[in-house]
Curated annotation (Swiss-Prot):
Cellular component GO terms held in the UniProt record: plasma membrane
Keywords for the protein's UniProt record, in alphabetical order: Amino-acid transport, Cell inner membrane, Cell membrane, Membrane, Symport, Transmembrane, Transmembrane helix, Transport
Lineage: Bacteria, Pseudomonadati, Pseudomonadota, Gammaproteobacteria, Alteromonadales
Subcellular location: Cell inner membrane
Keyword set includes Cytoplasm: no
Reaction catalysis annotation: L-serine(in) + Na(+)(in) = L-serine(out) + Na(+)(out); L-threonine(in) + Na(+)(in) = L-threonine(out) + Na(+)(out)
Name of the coding gene: sstT
GO molecular function, one term: neutral L-amino acid:sodium symporter activity
The protein's role, per its UniProt record: Involved in the import of serine and threonine into the cell, with the concomitant import of sodium (symport system).
Protein's recorded name: Serine/threonine transporter SstT
Amino acid sequence: MSSNPSLFSRIIHGSLVLQIIVGIALAVILASVSASAASQVAFLGDFFVGALKAIAPILVFVLVASSIANQKKNSHTNMRPIISLYLIGTFAAALTAVLLSFSFPTTLVLVTGIEGSNPPQGIAEVLNTLLFKLVDNPVNALMTGNYIGILAWGIGLGIALHHGTDATKAVLNDISHGVSQMVRFVIRLAPLGIFGLVAGTVAATGFDALAGYAQLLMVLVGAMLIMALVVNPLIVYLKIKRNPYPLVLKCLRGSGVTAFFTRSSAANIPVNMALCEELKLHEDTYSVSIPLGATVNMGGAAITITVLTLAAAHTLGVQVDFVTALLLSVMASVAACGASGVAGGSLLLIPLACSLFGISNDIAMQVVAVGFIIGVVQDSAETALNSSTDVLFTAAACEAAEAKANS
């Protein structure tokens, strides 16, 4: 005699996307009815993001070490084409931002700069920071979420254990599966976590503060939408030679939605890993490409840096020719790849880009302050684009390699 599944069982095995949509709707309703009540449930969002950030470093370290240690001879990880796609995507994002900024010139109402901010003094400093993150203490890298360092030590341990005994490799593989199971549990908390994040955000801002920056937000979000729905699909089509939209939409739905609300590429790594597993991608590939993408695949950051820099130039009446704009695209692309190595991310790399037009640091920091005001939307959209693209390009490279092998 069959029995109806319990409510708990239905929740555990139900559609995660549908549950997230319900959570968003309930959060908006709660914040509209009672801002104080919405503020009190905001801790659920902090708890969820904290759980993701806590599990992500150990997940990356164990998965990378396990996949390399257990890698079969003559197997290919397709990392070179994935890294190429990351770089092409980031530059295309900066170029898209330039074209949209030229089409819709934006003037900023500058405000007081952010106190205590310490932007990098040049591109050399950004690259220097990234280089030294490679040789960070492994324990410190795990504690601070330094994914460049975690990748380096994970790869090193994996190579060292590749020649170890089968028993050692089996233990590492079992630990990897155990951590992955913990990640699945944390991801099931997404509807509750996003409910708290949305409720807290709407209660705190009401989005009234964003009204004065409507055009700037339209250019920023518009550029990111064009990248997500036009440029990225075109890049993927050239790679896999078939309709890219089923894959694009699956990545946006499975990765972008969660990333939009967590506003953290690092926190979204476990979500992306689970999506890659669902897509049946090569574990040896995605265990490296996803954390690497969370560090260097920064199309959204390139858009933010480019749009706000050109908005500052337009506000000050600085004439920008096409060659200079092209140079800005290159600089924004390189700077964006180092965004994860700078406290404050893409916003604090804006002074670096502004220096290209001779804009003073004082003015540049006022532009950064504008970025913090619109950060609720800007950072969410930027993270959603960055994170979903990690899975998209990984899947495209894996599919192209598989098609080539079968031909």
